[in-house]
């Protein structure tokens, strides 16, 4: 019997494998995998459109596979839009997938305005047909009607309603003679190019519950963008702005959350913040420049620089928690509080009078490279008064030129929960916190939650009273 050398068998095996890869698998037991069985779009505002999401269709076989049909079940009438392997349209027929290969289907959604006030659901599916099988990828989006304001100037007294959110595109300006009043429960979403510029007056009248607070944030609500700092510019109280008041407001994910420029034009503070949360601002949470700000029972957290007060001004912070932790978005490299009486113009320090007071506050940071969380700088001979009373702070070098009374230094305030990996922060106080009962009576009856301060022998430090 004639024998063949081993190399012949190797060649024959290679030919067999090659032929197999060039042939199509036709059985119903062919393997098709999806990178996801559902694409979920978080809140999509009507008329604005969504981000693009994608799903991968994978041929898990060692032979070619013919996808006889990849189609959007709602067809051209669907609110979803497909791009199948680079070709736009609701359907593609007879798509060949090589052995082990895959293709991408890109999906967006555009939702028409309707009459619903509450969020509503929009659904469809993608059918993938092959070898007599039909499998489906589910598509789901939350739609939300809204008031849309593009490059808008408010030039007369205006009160918004809270039935629908407001989406700001291109910017919103409150003119010098106008007052904008935003009521409890209103939600305001800003596009990346949309600051709120206040030349007149802004009145925010929120309430203590999450559903009745007033929310200011970016308009990207899908993951992971919903928590990105710097997703919108922020709120700017400019030189002519007067009598601004924000109560139970949440300002999050801005570049500079609150900026107050120049002195008040009357005896009242330019900006009064009561029971507000300023969170996750990329550059600064509160930035004051020769201005006047009064803040009580406020939380300023996890910003590039939480509070920066420069070039003098008049500032009063009472029962505020000012805390920052390095996290997935912002490295903690700056003190949580910086106060100075000057700015540098060219090579010259220009000074202005400074009067700043901090009572019953917590200044803390961690997981960064900051050793002094409070920094105070003075130049020149202009009036300079910076006073701290009954505060807990993290400082290795106590600032010079200040007065301080009953301070607690470098003792962990024992916040309830800080989990940077999960981006979860609860700045309530644990039992046994050194901040409990260490404050003085300031006449403020309630904390940030709206709970009474009259618990224990004395008020607690920070924005939350341990109940």
What are these regions (language model features)?
Residues 73-91:
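Short, solvent-exposed loop/linker segments at beta-strand-coil boundaries, enriched for Pro/Gly
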Residues 20-25, 32-43, 48-50, 54, ...:
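Beta-strand/loop edge motif enriched in small/polar residues
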Residues 15-18:
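C-terminal motif of bacterial Sec signal peptides marking the signal peptidase cleavage site
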Residues 1-8:
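Bacterial N-terminal signal peptides that target proteins for export
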Residues 57-61:
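Asparagine-centered strand-capping/turn motif at beta-strand->loop junctions
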Residues 449-453:
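Cytochrome P450 C-terminal beta-domain/meander region
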Residues 50-51, 62-67:
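Short acidic/proline- and small/hydrophobic-mixed sequence motifs that coincide with surface turns
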